[in-house]
Amino acid sequence: MRAPLGLLLFALAAHTSTAAAQTWSPEQQELWRVEDQQWKMAAAKDLTWIETMVHPNVSFWNANQPAPQNKASLSRWEKYDTANRTVLEQELFPISVTITGNVAVVQYRYQVAAENYKKERETVTGRYTDVFIKEGGRWLFITWAGGDDPKK
């Protein structure tokens, strides 16, 4: 969001592809669980994921933002977006989980149905590449890039 990140990383009760998960190592599965949990927390408007799952030195760039952002910016915009948007349904589609030492890259697509404060509904799709660093035995988001696909 992973998600909110952008319009979406506030989302997601993710569903994973069983076939993909069956071919992953235990460490890859662990990373996907972290990703899945972040989307679920964001969808539930539980912003504690920012303090518990994001590295203090995070720098990320969502497709809908004018420049890279830091953790303070993430908190500010997630609070705003969470107050103005509700996720109705979401699904994640894992593509890859690559691990090298204490760094991991997770790539996936998503689909989110949401409702804004005006009660207008919209379904969007998009993609993210998230990078994690393992510190103290935990995987933390250190950067990500992506967001909604362009409107057709």
Where are these regions (language model features)?
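Boundary at the C-terminal end of the N-terminal hydrophobic targeting segment
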Residues: 16-21
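Short beta-strand segments enriched in hydrophobic/aromatic residues
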Residues: 54, 110-112, 145-148
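Short beta-strand edge/turn micro-motifs at domain boundaries
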Residues: 105, 125-151
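Beta-strand elements of well-folded, non-transmembrane domains
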Residues: 112-116, 132
